[in-house]
Amino acid sequence: MKPITIRPYTTDVETVKSVFYDKSTIDFNIDEDPRFIIDVGANIGLVSAYFAHRFPNALIISLEPEESNFEILKLNAKSYKNIVPIQKALWYVNTTINIFSTNEGNGGFVATDKKYNSDTSRNMSENYSLNIQPKNSIVETITIESIMDDHNIDFLDIVKIDIEGAEKDIFD
């Protein structure tokens, strides 16, 4: 593994422990080396870096919409020629969406295509049991189909998804 960048005194430290010590995200067997991997909700790129090291011939597309996480993801991707960082959120349509902070550190936010207002905040707070606050971020989204078309991918070998509960919005 090549050196990685993390932010001290943040949730990055817990993420390092989860990825590299608990290995709950990455401990699996695969019969053949994958060609195409998508890391959705890449955060600062730790899983992407692990995949790039483990599968040096695979193309790894790393999606992360949150700006501060994406900046660190870009730093961590620089050491690997096979990681392509993209600052977009995975969604069911190519559009823009709002990001709401959950006040849970740099990993905690909720993406929605609903505009922020007190009703949205109350509804999302009840659904997620969180204190939702506007983060004033609008991010571009992309579909799996668009990613595959943009990178001439015919088959995805591995898809890692960690998107703060938005999985339901994408796959419903």
Could you say what each language-model-derived stretch is?
Residues 1-172:
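Phosphate/nucleotide-binding beta-alpha loop and adjacent structural elements of enzyme active sites
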